């Protein structure tokens, strides 16, 4: 389960943050599930290393424009690409009418099956491997939080142990794998649980936006590996948060603490906290961390692979490190305005390029040896690179400046 943030701004896009969308990539089934689809989400997908053709399900939280205005464009482009056979869209009542109206009045015909599901609190989707549930949050219009839960996996079966005890091959091994007790013809009895490691706990991700603090978010997020929660406002703007039914940084942290999640990502920031303003997103992070220390800031294109063992993944730089924050600091320091956007794009292009490159390309274009290329590939396999600073820190011997020109 790999999360990529495609939009982390509330209401309107800023130069460095697009409006809401989060991609969940499920590598084992080559599928991407999107959560919200703000305007220009398809442009963000093109700038990421995700493949639009893998989008299989789209979950919409609510009908506000910053969460759905990119939906129709993306669905249309998926049709033109001709590589999609079915997309299922889930969302609140009126989403089906919105989609039907757009299709009708823009005379759009999709060459694939589009299934629109109106969700209600409870189970939304389940196929044995993954279950998606939702709860009604507390916003100005009906808004749903979603939880994706992966099923537990059976622990490893120690076949060599069974062989050593002389248990004959065949159906008995299947029964042992299932943890059942078997009796051999010679009268010996074995408990299958003695031959299997404990089951691997399935992972979970919860997405709560838009909402003011509410109990249903706490219930939905119980013990989740990752909670992505909106933090539109800083703590000192709590009055605004209550008036507009959005969350402050401290409300998000309280949900995380009450739900005992492992990791909290703050997202959906008001543009008033953009670089150069008196209060910035780093201040929201500090407020949240005072309540829930394991909090990080989401930023566009930030990638996080949820580890299987329930540990916090240490591969990603912490959100307040220079590497992760470099887009924001760039923007705060560079002039003129046009140069800022170009510089931010160019600065992180190498990270995107290296996430796509083959080993041969790396060796040729960067002039590095096979050992270094393999080390980079191995690191990439564990965790995609999110910014140039991370690459520079890990592999200072490589001249990264050539990458964005060459790939
Ligand atoms: Zn919103
Ligand atoms: Zn909203």
Curated annotation (Swiss-Prot):
The active site is at 66 (proton acceptor). Pfam families: Lactamase_B_2 (PF12706). Residues 309-407 are annotated as: Unknown. Transmembrane segments: none annotated. It catalyses: Endonucleolytic cleavage of RNA, removing extra 3' nucleotides from tRNA precursor, generating 3' termini of tRNAs. A 3'-hydroxy group is left at the tRNA terminus and a 5'-phosphoryl group is left at the trailer molecule. Its EC number is 3.1.26.11. The keyword Metal-binding applies. SUPFAM superfamilies: Metallo-hydrolase/oxidoreductase, RuvA domain 2-like. Zn(2+) 2 binds at residues 66-67, 210, 268. It is an enzyme of class 3 (hydrolase). One of its GO terms (molecular function) is 3'-tRNA processing endoribonuclease activity. Residues 1-308 are annotated as: Ribonuclease Z. Keywords: Endonuclease, Hydrolase, Metal-binding, Nuclease, tRNA processing, Zinc. Binds 2 Zn(2+) ions. The keyword Signal does not apply. It comes from the Bacteria. InterPro entries: Metallo-B-lactamas (IPR001279), RibonucZ/Hydroxyglut_hydro (IPR036866), RNase_Z/BN (IPR013471), RuvA_2-like (IPR010994). Its cofactor is Zn(2+). Zn(2+) 1 binds at residues 62, 64, 139, 210. Zinc phosphodiesterase, which displays some tRNA 3'-processing endonuclease activity. Probably involved in tRNA maturation, by removing a 3'-trailer from precursor tRNA. Homodimer. Belongs to the RNase Z family. HAMAP family: RNase_Z_BN. This is Ribonuclease Z. It comes from Thermosynechococcus vestitus (strain NIES-2133 / IAM M-273 / BP-1).
């Amino acid at each position: 389960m790999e999360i990529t943030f495609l939009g982390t701004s509330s209401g309107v896009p800023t130069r460095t943050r697009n409006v809401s969308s989060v991609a969940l990539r499920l590598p084992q089934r080559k599928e991407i599930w999107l959560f919200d689809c703000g305007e220009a989400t398809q442009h963000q997908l093109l700038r990421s290393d995700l493949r639009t053709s893998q989008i299989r399900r789209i979950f919409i939280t609510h009908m506000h424009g910053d969460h759905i205005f990119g939906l129709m464009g993306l669905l249309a482009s998926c049709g033109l690409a001709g590589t999609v056979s079915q997309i299922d869209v889930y969302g609140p009542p009126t989403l089906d009418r919105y989609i039907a109206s757009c299709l009708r009045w823009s005379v759009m015909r999709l060459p694939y099956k589009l299934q629109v599901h109106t969700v209600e609190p409870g189970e939304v989707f389940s196929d044995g491997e993954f279950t998606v549930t939702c709860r009604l949050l507390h916003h100005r219009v009906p808004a749903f939080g979603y939880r994706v839960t992966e099923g537990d996996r059976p622990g490893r079966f120690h076949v060599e142990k069974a062989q050593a005890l002389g248990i004959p091959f065949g159906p008995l091994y299947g029964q042992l794998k299932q943890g059942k007790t078997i009796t051999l013809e010679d009268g010996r009895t074995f408990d299958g649980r003695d031959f299997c490691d404990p089951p691997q706990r399935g992972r979970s991700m919860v997405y709560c936006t838009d909402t003011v603090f509410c109990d249903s978010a706490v219930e939905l997020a119980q013990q989740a590996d990752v909670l992505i929660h909106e933090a539109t406002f800083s703590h000192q703007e709590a009055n605004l948060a209550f008036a507009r039914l959005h969350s402050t940084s401290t409300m998000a942290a309280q949900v995380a603490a009450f739900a005992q999640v492992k990791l909290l990502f703050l997202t959906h920031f008001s543009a008033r906290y953009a670089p150069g303003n008196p209060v910035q997103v780093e201040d929201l992070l500090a407020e949240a961390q005072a309540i829930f220390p394991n909090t990080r800031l989401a930023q566009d294109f930030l990638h996080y692979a949820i580890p299987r063992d329930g540990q916090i993944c240490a591969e990603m730089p912490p959100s307040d490190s220079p590497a992760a924050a470099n887009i924001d600091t760039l923007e705060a320091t560079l002039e003129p305005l046009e140069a800022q956007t170009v510089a931010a794009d160019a600065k992180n292009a190498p990270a995107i390029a290296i996430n796509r490159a083959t080993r041969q390309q790396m060796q040729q274009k960067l002039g590095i040896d096979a050992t270094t290329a393999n080390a980079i590939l191995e690191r990439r396999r564990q965790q995609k690179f999110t910014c140039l600073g991370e690459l520079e820190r890990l592999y200072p011997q490589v001249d990264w400046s050539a990458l964005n020109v060459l790939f």
